[in-house]
A protein has these predicted regions:
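N-terminal glycine-rich phosphate-binding loop and ensuing alpha1 helix
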Residues: 43-44, 58, 93-160
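Conserved beta-loop-beta/alpha segment of the NTase-like Rossmann-fold superfamily
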Residues: 163-236
Length: 629
């Protein structure tokens, strides 16, 4: 009903400021209605405020605030204060007008891993870490509730079960992002989009820490929080116009306002923004996009303001060392088993463990890099359930046995009980390359040194026993999915019986001598790492396992055998290697099926290993005399 009056007075305001033409479009009206909404909100939150109070809180000139107040008075949204002269209070009409700006809820992004916070995030999602005794996500939930925002959705993924308790404690909703491990926050917003459409919503990061409560029951227009960074910064730097509207974003800058912390989506903003986000989600090559990438690509279409925050209000901890500087408790006690162990082994306080960095996780373990006194080390943490699959006491025995050879990683500590291992990190080292035959020559020399060392341990790697072991595990955890499994299993038994009849020699073997487990040091020397499966076995199994891990074709395997033997292999040697290729493929396919039943996924690895079992059984059957055929 009162739109014409709004239009006339807004035109007057713009003429006064000489910033926009008099023929205002709807977006300009929205801009000023948002400012009127802010006047109403501030008066609701702070009754009996003066013009000067409002100008200070809104960071506007007294003249602009005076014009906005006149507009609010004309619309009957505010009235002069009854008890204190020179102040204003919200009317019933103002309350009704303000309702359109009511915040409907908040979406908290908590799906990611937090790789820069290892080893803490191996056990605990980053948002559940405590700062001054309070978990970061719980602090934000508490602040939201204090502001009157009750409807809270948490987008989860990594260690999602850790957030379940929040349902009972705060009556939140958990929303699962199935792509958390392979895509970035664009995908998280995509999967949560139904919670955003048609609503006024905060978008928060679970791992932010906010000093003061910056949330409100009412928000007027979309915004992105910003903090001023002095000096050079690698954050996303904002450009904005005199109205506070963001006009551009660049990566990195100096002495600038940057994207930092909470965001607010109005329902109008979401109606325009989310369809474009859906398009980008469907576009190949956007898998690692942040949701902000969509905003950056289309600033000409979306209207979102900067919400400048004071210094020391918003904290986004980049790593554990930043958190240590902020919360001194982490300097001495992190309540993390790995860091406590390192401190004990090196006899230093946790504060001297620094430059922590996540290393690429293997198929069974998690590892991270750290420094003490300028030297780099690796700490290995056994993966979930590996205690059932790997005998850590036997692994420790192997490491003690091979130390005189000088072919393994330099061991600092290993526990036969927990499986934790600490070793030196070789700066400048690289993994060998499976198809670099010069690398393979160097690696095979190390294998020869191991096989011919005469060293022994008290345990064996019995591939028959291991196959039956993993078969039982699979049958206990959902079964084995291969349609022809029983037939292939019978073929593997034939190969096992054939090998047993040959009375093959048993020496200390690595079992997992794949290219990734050979390190080429800067001086060209080679180290063989990860001895979890090592034991007494036929030495040729190491060639077979190396081949199937690297997805070798037959000609590649032939080349590897020639390098190892220093000649063309004879038929018996080839038969043995091929047999172990089949058996190794069968074993690791069962291993992968079992791991998949626990929620881990290895893509095509399972099928490739199963194909090795079938293909190399046929090669043995067709080319060599297999007993019983």
């Amino acid at each position: 009903m009162r739109a014409p009056a709004v239009r006339l007075n807004i035109v007057h305001l713009q003429n006064q400021q000489n910033t926009e033409p008099t023929n205002l479009n709807n977006k300009m009206e929205d801009f000023f209605m948002n400012r009127i909404g802010l006047i109403c909100r501030y008066l609701k939150e702070n009754p009996h405020s003066s013009q000067r109070d409002l100008a200070q809180k809104m960071e506007l000139s007294l003249g602009t605030v005076n014009t906005l107040i006149k507009e609010c008075m004309n619309l009957h949204y505010i009235a002069p204060g009854k008890s204190i002269a020179g102040t204003y209070e919200l009317t019933c009409e103002g309350e009704t007008f303000l309702n359109q700006f009511k915040v409907d809820g908040a979406l908290i992004l908590a799906a990611g891993f937090g790789s820069r916070f290892v080893p803490l995030t191996f056990e605990t999602p980053k948002g559940l870490l405590e700062v001054f005794g309070e978990r970061m996500i719980e602090r934000q939930i508490r602040q939201l509730r204090e502001a009157g925002v009750e409807n809270i959705t948490i987008a989860v993924g990594y260690l999602k079960e850790k957030f379940e308790y929040l349902i009972d404690k705060y009556n939140v909703t958990l929303l699962y992002n199935p792509e958390y491990s392979c895509k970035n926050t664009l995908a998280t917003i995509y999967h949560a989009r139904k919670a955003l459409y048609g609503k006024n919503m905060y978008i928060l990061s679970s791992d932010n820490w906010l000093r003061e409560n910056m949330f409100h029951k009412y928000e007027c227009g979309a915004w992105y929080a910003s903090t001023y960074m002095e000096g050079k910064t690698s954050e996303w730097v904002l450009s904005y116009n005199k109205k506070g509207r963001i006009t551009d974003v660049t990566v990195g800058g100096e002495n600038a306002w940057v994207m930092y912390g909470p965001v607010y989506f109005s329902r109008e903003f979401s109606a325009e923004f989310l369809p474009e986000l859906e398009k980008e989600y469907e576009t190949p090559g956007t898998e690692q996009f942040y949701w902000e990438n969509v905003l950056i690509h289309h600033f000409d279409r979306f209207e979102i303001d900067i919400n400048r925050q004071p210094a020391n209000q918003i904290y986004e901890f980049e790593n554990l060392e930043e958190l240590r500087r902020f919360d001194s408790r982490y300097q001495t006690r992190s309540n993390n088993e790995a860091l406590e162990l390192i401190a004990k082994v090196f006899r230093v306080p946790e504060s001297e463990i620094h430059d922590l960095r996540c290393l690429k996780s293997g198929m069974t373990n998690k590892s991270f890099l750290f420094q003490i006194d300028g030297k780099s080390y690796i700490c290995r943490i056994p993966g979930p359930g590996t205690g059932l699959l790997i005998n850590r006491r036997e692994e420790a025995e192997v490491y003690r046995t091979i130390q005189p050879l000088g072919i393994s990683d330099r061991l600092i500590y290993i526990s036969g009980d927990t499986g934790y291992k600490i070793s030196r990190y070789y700066d400048g080292a690289r993994n060998s390359e499976a198809f670099n035959w010069n690398d393979m020559r160097a690696c095979m020399k190390v294998l020869h040194q191991l096989h011919e060392s005469g060293l022994t341990v008290d345990h064996s790697f019995d591939i028959r026993e291991r196959i039956l072991f993993y078969e039982r595990l699979c049958l206990q955890h959902g079964g084995i999915p291969f349609e022809d499994y029983q037939n292939v299993r019978a073929q593997m038994i034939e190969l096992l019986d054939q090998l047993d009849s040959m009375n093959r020699p048993k020496v200390l073997s690595h079992i997992d001598a794949n290219a990734d487990n050979f390190l080429i040091l800067k001086d060209g020397s080679v180290r063989l790492i990860d001895w979890e499966y090592a034991g007494m076995c036929d030495p040729l199994i190491d060639l077979s396992m190396a081949g199937i891990y690297s997805y070798y074709k037959e000609e590649d395997l032939e080349k590897l055998m020639e390098i190892y033997f220093g000649r063309i292999p004879d038929n018996t040697e080839r038969l043995v290697v091929y047999s172990y290729v089949a058996l190794g493929g069968f074993l690791w396919s069962l291993w992968a099926v079992y791991k998949a039943s626990l929620g881990e996924e290895f893509g095509e690895y399972t099928i490739i290993q199963y194909r090795y079992a079938k293909a190399y059984y046929r090669k043995v059957k067709e080319r060599y005399c297999l007993q019983g055929i």
